[in-house]
Structure formats: structure tokens, C-alpha cells
Amino acid sequence: MLAAMELAVTAVRDDEIDPLVEVTAQAFIDEQLLRWPLGDHPDPLAVMQAEFRGLHSAAARLGCLWQAGDAAGAASWISPDAADSFWEQLMSWHDGVAAQADDGGARYEQLWDWVLGCYPDEPHWALDSIAVDPAMRRGGIGGLLIDHGLAMADADGLPAILETTRPHLVPYYGKFGFVVFEEGDGPGGGPQVWFMRRPPAR
């Protein structure tokens, strides 16, 4: 197994996203920000693949999708300049969780309106998603991708933001300087979410 330090982090083109869609869909199959609004579905993995095809395509077109090595891991770091266009592209995507949810997407819309409303008004870089190939986990690849995004945020003198529903990831992100600034349960019985911010390096 290659050490993370041996892997280059490179921007991903839209025509290169297929293996990263697979890696990320598998990693997010139990992520409640997507799984809870989906509800009862016979093939949640296929839905996650469709969701991340839209997410990764939008990020790649904006120069915001990064990979470590040859699809060993992927991170979507959304810059403040790209944020509006990123969300506009997603709103036109009709093949993911919202489209296939058992309630027609009502939970998805309600949850994500709440999530985005918890984001700070200040300009920031957002870690929209991060995933590592299961065969390559625990080798530092996730940290490599996080550090890459934080370096871009630091170059702009801006904070970085993320959210997670996985409590074990809160201390993990804390190792990179992220601190919880808000925590709460999503509306309508939605999942517990931790919102974290990492200030720019001094």
C-alpha cells in the first residue's frame, strides 16, 4: 500500500469522476444527511451513486474536486467563489436522493434548507464531501485531502467549514483544527448534525 505522502493531490476533470463516484457512494451509504431523507428504497447504493454523479460533476466543472493518487480518495472543497454556481447546478440535478426519496424529496429539501441556514455568513471554504477507497483507508489519505483544502483556505485567509452526522468524526476533524460551532437535530425528526469551523492559519 502506498503511503499518503507518496500520492499527489490533483484536480479532477468531469470525464474522470466515475471511479470517484463509486468510492464516495460506498463511503456515504450510511451518512444520515443523505440516507435519512431517502427513506425506504430497495437500492440505496444506486441512489448514492446517482447523487454523487451530480455532486462530483458540478464540483469538477468548477475546479473544486480533488483526488489523491489514482482515485485512492476524493474530496470536494467548494470555494466561496464557486459556491453559488455549485448549488445552482445541484438544484438542476434530478437523479439523486431528492428525486428518488419515498416522500418525493420533502425531507431532503427541509433538511438541506436547515443545514445551509446553519452555515456562517462569512466567506469560507466548505468540505462538501470526502471519501477514501476502502482498501486504502487508515493510511493518511483522508488527512492528505483535508490538508490540501485547508492550504487553499489559508492561502485565501479564510476559514473552512464542514458538517457531519458521525460523532466519531468530530474528534478526528478536531485534529485538523476544526471546532464545533453549532450542533442540533434536523427538522422533522432529522439526524443530529455537528457543524465545524476551522479558522485560517495565522
Predicted regions and their residues:
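Conserved acetyl-CoA-binding loop-helix of GNAT-fold acetyltransferases
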Residues: 132, 138-151
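Conserved beta-hairpin
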Residues: 57-77
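Conserved N-terminal entry element of GNAT/NAT acetyltransferase domains
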Residues: 1-18
